[in-house]
Structure formats: structure tokens, C-alpha cells
Amino acid sequence: MKNIKSKKRVKELGEVFTPPELVNEILDKLPAHVWHPKKTFMEPSCGTGNFLVEIAKRKLSLGHKPQDVAQSLFGIDIMEDNVRECRERLVKLLGDKYASIINENIECRDALK
């Protein structure tokens, strides 16, 4: 995965993607209680879902049900192509059965408005 899609998008939007290795390094530093099944995660600039996908993988590895994982993840991005890719990645990981939850929870809009 590339860290940028285009120089224009970096300049206009400040769009840079966090590589999965760094995402996992950050997630490793979180305390154990954040992985409780009822805890939710909200990513206000989710991009293509690097954080949300890695969070979902961890929750699944802890034995959380895919439906519970889908219901616990929320994301916003201003770019439609990023939102589409984020949704696709989460559906691929969690299953088509949860597409409606994922589509509702991952929104295309400006998180600052």
C-alpha cells in the first residue's frame, strides 16, 4: 500500500495514509481494556481503513463475533473513493453479511462540519 494517492491530494487535503506496520505499533501501545467487546472505535479521517481494518483483525483474534466487530467500528472520510475502499476492506474481512452495518458506520463527509 502506498502512503499517498497523489501529490495533489496531499497538497489540497493533507492526505497521507498510515502504513499498517505503524498502525500496529500504535495499537500495541493501547491498554488491554480498550479491547473489551463493548468498546467502540471512531476514526474521523479513516482514509482507506488502515486503522479500522487492523482494529477489526485484533478484535476477531480475541474471539469477538464479526457482527459485534462491525457494530463497534465507525469511520468518516471526505473522499468517496477512500470510503468505498474502507468499506470493501471491512466487508472482505468481516463478511458480506455485515455490509449494511459497515456501509452505515463508514460515512463520506467532512468530520469537521
Q: Whereabouts are the PLM-identified features?
A:
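SAM-dependent methyltransferase catalytic region
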Residues: 1-113
